[in-house]
From Swiss-Prot:
Coiled-coil zones: none
GO molecular function, one term: DNA binding
Keyword list, A-Z: DNA-binding, Transcription, Transcription regulation
Protein name as it appears in the record: Uncharacterized HTH-type transcriptional regulator HI_0570
Source domain of life: Bacteria
InterPro entries: DesT_TetR_C (IPR054129), DNA-bd_HTH_TetR-type_CS (IPR023772), Homeodomain-like_sf (IPR009057), HTH_TetR (IPR001647), HTH_transcr_repressor_FabR (IPR050692)
Length: 205
């Protein structure tokens, strides 16, 4: 019986997270969400919300954690495509833009909360983005035999470029996004050339 209750509790908690993500939009940030509206969409009474989260901030922090996890899963998915013979930069950009298209509100949350008014949210969002940079740097270092420093600088540059492009892409038409993708691919190729130059300089070449 206790096991059934635990499963039901987890399902309701999941429904609350999904409901909150669903309510985000270009006009509505997390700080504008109402506990009552989130609970209603999740199919529970507002008072039942507190059985799952102590307040809306705790719900928001869980959403930020989940967004970060999705980003890292995204990169692993891109790696599989690359290992199957795809171009590193083109595949990475395509995968990231698919994420923006398919998980728009997840990206919006990370984007907004990394520069929002809540210190706790800013810290959590920055931590998730740094995890993403760290994992990407590790992959670059392994793939190209770069030093940790050069790999980290390149990874940080990649994330800065794609996040900025992602923010711009949210309000673009499909044709405009394709043009943006082409520019981002060129920018990342330029960055890769610079990283290669820096790595060779370190090696004394």
């Amino acid at each position: 019986m206790a096991g059934v209750r635990a499963v039901q509790k987890e399902k309701t908690r999941r429904a609350l997270v999904d409901a909150a993500f669903n309510q985000l939009s270009a006009e509505k940030s997390f700080s504008n969400l109402s506990l009552r509206e989130v609970a209603r969409e999740a199919g529970i009474a507002p008072t039942s919300f507190y059985r799952h989260f102590s307040d809306m901030d705790e719900l928001g922090l869980e959403m930020v954690d989940e967004a970060g996890l999705m980003l890292r899963q995204l990169m692993r998915q891109a790696r599989k495509r690359i290992d199957a013979g795809g171009s590193v930069i083109s595949v990475s950009v395509d995968t990231f833009f698919e994420f923006i298209t398919n998980s728009t509100n997840v990206f919006r949350l990370l984007l907004r909360e990394s520069s929002g008014t809540s210190q706790a949210f800013r810290t959590a969002a920055a931590r998730e983005i740094k995890h993403f940079v760290d994992e990407l740097a590790e992959y670059i270092s392994y793939k190209h035999q770069y030093s940790q420093y050069v790999a980290y600088v390149q990874a940080e540059g990649i994330v800065t470029i794609v996040f900025t492009a992602g923010a711009n892409a949210l309000d673009m038409s499909k044709a405009e996004r394709e043009q943006l993708k082409a520019r981002v691919i060129l920018q990342l190729r330029m960055l890769a050339k610079g990283a290669d130059f820096a790595a060779n300089k370190e090696r004394g070449k």
